[in-house]
Amino acid sequence: MRVPRPQPWALGLLLFLLPGSLGAESHLSLLYHLTAVSSPAPGTPAFWVSGWLGPQQYLSYDSLRGQAEPCGAWVWENQVSWYWEKETTDLRIKEKLFLEAFKALGGKGPYTLQGLLGCELSPDNTSVPTAKFALNGEEFMNFDLKQGTWGGDWPEALAISQRWQQQDKAANKELTFLLFSCPHRLREHLERGRGNLEWKEPPSMRLKARPGNPGFSVLTCSAFSFYPPELQLRFLRNGMAAGTGQGDFGPNSDGSFHASSSLTVKSGDEHHYCCIVQHAGLAQPLRVELETPAKSSVLVVGIVIGVLLLTAAAVGGALLWRRMRSGLPAPWISLRGDDTGSLLPTPGEAQDADSKDINVIPATA
């Protein structure tokens, strides 16, 4: 299931807070990015969370599944048995708080409420907590560690803070998480799964052409399922730089990433172009040639042949089942020559003398 993203105007906090950690491999931090929407589309969650260990997403949660789940290489982390149950319990509490916030705001909406909670280890190994919140893409509230409560200048911040403080020990739980639970979890992850932070997955590549405006074609160079997220795509024309085109980039549900770049060229000129990709998972830059129609046709033919073979196998199996159910031998047994009579005699055919019952007493004259 695809988790919905915040509205374009509500992406400010996410885009502001995450790029620094995504671009720094040595950034030792544990961050939870939480999002709630007041009017979710049918079949989509009202609340979802992504958890990040440094540059890697390690956790996902949404209100439809109701379970915290590991992502990417962290699926194989040797964690204690109760760890994910604890994550699930904590995030269900956060879900309740975020949805309660909409009640405090009234029914004017729609609203998108986001939060960034977590901690970062400084060079001297001390923990620096983070607790920021945004409403419809604008930061409006934080958690004051000295006061032990939420605060901000907006009236909405006051309304939400008062609502949350009515929840049993909510402020105390927030303070405990930021000062103690978060740094403990971060150090545990670094101890148990430090190798995961060195995970490198090279991209699967494809360069395709499609018709564009009259007289032009659009080349799209696509990279699939790679990690870390830093990747460079560029086009060459006859070996010369032709630009980077217009790009797209995003995360996958398994913790890897995808990216693409498109370039408009003259029709008939497509085969003069190639795509060059650079990534930490590749020993050297990879040259990606344009996918030809012939290759696509071979793929389609292979799929068709595979379907036909599967269909033939299914039909043959059904016919064999009907034959054996009616008492007839399997075809390969009927073709075994001399063995036929001794194994399964053909219906209506007399047995050989050697096959008669030796215990039968001959009739007396």
From Swiss-Prot:
CDD domains: IgC1_MHC-like_FcRn. It comes from the Eukaryota. Residues 322-365 are cytoplasmic. InterPro entries: Ig-like_dom, Ig-like_dom_sf, Ig-like_fold, Ig/MHC_CS, Ig_C1-set, MHC_class-I_related, MHC_I-like_Ag-recog, MHC_I-like_Ag-recog_sf. It is found in: Cell membrane; Endosome membrane. Residues 201-290 are annotated as: Alpha-3. Glycans are attached at residue 125. GO terms for molecular function: beta-2-microglobulin binding; IgG binding. Cell surface receptor that transfers passive humoral immunity from the mother to the newborn. Binds to the Fc region of monomeric immunoglobulin gamma and mediates its selective uptake from milk. IgG in the milk is bound at the apical surface of the intestinal epithelium. The resultant FcRn-IgG complexes are transcytosed across the intestinal epithelium and IgG is released from FcRn into blood or tissue fluids. Throughout life, contributes to effective humoral immunity by recycling IgG and extending its half-life in the circulation. This is IgG receptor FcRn large subunit p51. It comes from Macaca fascicularis (Crab-eating macaque). The gene is FCGRT.
